[in-house]
């Protein structure tokens, strides 16, 4: 039998294997209609409004910083009127989804791992089995669905706040009228960009929820191990967010199809 330190390693292969299997079980239970809707509404508040302030603050600041850097370069090229469009492309396609999902992973993913991990080490999960209650239906599926529903909304709100931050900086420091900024945004952004943004939000939400729950369910030991699981869940969720973002970019991005002449 493997030592406990190996079995409960924060980044052990056993945890990754369990989480991949858990994702399959989540799909199966979802297709069978097995979930606790009351629990979903409860977790919608925990993952949505509870995460809104840090998400909006991070996106506003990121929007202001990105606009400063972009406008500085475009002004030297005489293309300051295009700052809104360049900002919108980068922020909508990459920055808003990644920043928002990272904040949610830090706040919600760690909470899921800690909550379920604490239940695991205190044998509350075993008690659910005794009561013939499936933890996937009662604990995991509601959390994952709540993340899938709220992360896209938070990303859209973050995008709006980022644009507002960009408008403020462009107007205050570069004398670019807000209408010119917004017209540039409208000219560069396409409807497919918003669709991809929502698609990324669902993927990121599913990853955050599944990893947080998976790391919680594979926690053994005591309070120290619960903390380690929560920390590891945030790290793994962050990596998963970037991997999924790369996959979506490769699948749906406008990649060159041939070599230049």
Give the ranges of each region predicted by the language model.
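Hydrophobic alpha-helical transmembrane segments that constitute the membrane-spanning cores
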Residues: 58-61, 101, 141-170, 211, ...
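A hydrophobic alpha-helix feature that marks transmembrane segments and, especially
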Residues: 102-120
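Short cytoplasmic-facing helical segments at TM-TM junctions of multi-pass membrane proteins
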Residues: 116-141, 223-226
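Final/C-terminal transmembrane alpha-helix of multipass membrane proteins
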Residues: 226, 234-249
